[in-house]
Amino acid sequence: MVWLNGEPRPLEGKTLKEVLEEMGVELKGVAVLLNEEAFLGLEVPDRPLRDGDVVEVVALMQGG
């Protein structure tokens, strides 16, 4: 199982980019944590997810 935003999901073998695209995530506006390593959305590694991976997707917001 892969943990995606705190929920276990059977996503092994899919790439992180595939999963984000299937979720309809706009890569420009997010940060992604993959096993506690942070990436801006456009820099997300295109590697297959493995059992035990932990992914958190966080929307970036501007304030003023």
UniProtKB/Swiss-Prot annotation:
The modification 1-thioglycine is found at residue 64. GO terms for molecular function: nucleotide binding. Coiled coil: none annotated. GO terms for biological process: thiamine biosynthetic process; thiamine diphosphate biosynthetic process. Pathway: Cofactor biosynthesis; thiamine diphosphate biosynthesis. CDD domains: Ubl_ThiS (cd00565). C-terminal thiocarboxylation occurs in 2 steps, it is first acyl-adenylated (-COAMP) by TtuC, then thiocarboxylated (-COSH) by the cysteine desulfurases IscS or SufS. InterPro entries: Beta-grasp_dom_sf (IPR012675), Mopterin_synth/thiamin_S_b (IPR016155), Thi_S (IPR010035), ThiS/MoaD-like (IPR003749). The modification Glycyl adenylate is found at residue 64. Gene3D superfamilies: 3.10.20.30. There is a cross-link at residue 64 (Glycyl cysteine thioester (Gly-Cys) (interchain with C-192 in TtuC)). Keywords: Nucleotide-binding, Phosphoprotein, Thiamine biosynthesis, Thioester bond. Pfam families: ThiS. Belongs to the sulfur carrier protein ThiS family. Is the sulfur donor in the synthesis of the thiazole phosphate moiety of thiamine phosphate. This is Sulfur carrier protein ThiS. It comes from Thermus thermophilus (strain ATCC BAA-163 / DSM 7039 / HB27).
